Regions:
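Acidic/His- and Gly-rich active-site-bordering loop/insert found
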Residues: 1-98, 107-110, 114-123
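Histidine/acidic-residue-rich, glycine-tolerant segments that coordinate divalent metal ions
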Residues: 79-81, 87-97, 104, 121-199
């Protein structure tokens, strides 16, 4: 298995899918179009899925050999911000944009599912690719857990794009990172941006 080479072969398709999601951002709890697009891709490639709600999709890939169940979580919601960038795939929805990379995360999830499906006969265990709504402080993980469809997951993994690192690199740390221990409110005046890096 050479996942990197295979993933690079999907680059054109991935870019088109990403740009479509970027043009059509959806707020927390209303990621219905995003999930329809995800489901179209999964169905086209024969990937089993669980669809407990219009805004939650869980792709399921069973490996040929027994093993544990792994959850791979990808968030889908956008931010309530006006996009100021002038790119060909700019948000078509006033006051909404993918400013935190969830369009990229969702794209990664779709193509991870495709790669795992392609190699299912070589894999152990079960893989659940979870397209989570409402990650932006809106209890989307609770919504997924409440479905009961991830109670069998032995280990969860997630990812986040970060512009501080070069494209094509992976950075990991043992244990949790950037876990939210508490909520607080502050007021920042500026042009706009993500709460982690306000302008």
């Amino acid at each position: 298995m050479n996942f990197l080479n295979e993933a690079q072969a999907y680059e054109g398709e991935m870019r088109a899918f990403f740009e479509d999601l970027h043009r059509h951002p959806e707020p927390s709890h209303f990621e219905n179009r995003t999930n329809r697009r995800v489901r179209e891709q999964l169905k086209a490639h024969g990937i089993d899925m669980l669809c407990p709600k219009d805004n939650i999709t869980i792709a399921v890939i069973h490996g040929a050999k027994p093993g544990k169940t792994v959850g791979l979580r990808f968030d889908t919601d956008a931010l309530q911000l006006q996009e100021l960038c002038d790119v060909p795939y700019k948000s078509e929805h006033d006051g909404l944009m993918h400013g935190c990379g969830h369009d990229a995360h969702t794209t990664c999830g779709v193509y991870v599912a495709r790669l795992l499906k392609t190699h299912a006969d070589e894999l152990c265990g079960t893989y659940k690719i979870i397209f989570q709504p409402a990650e932006e402080g809106e209890h989307g993980a609770d919504e997924v857990i409440a479905t009961g469809l991830v109670s069998d997951v032995d280990a969860f993994f997630g990812l986040h794009v970060w512009s501080l690192y070069p494209t094509g690199t992976l950075h990991a740390t043992p244990g949790g990172i950037w876990a939210e221990p508490d909520m607080f409110k502050i007021t920042i005046h500026g042009k706009g941006g993500h709460g982690a890096t306000p302008e």
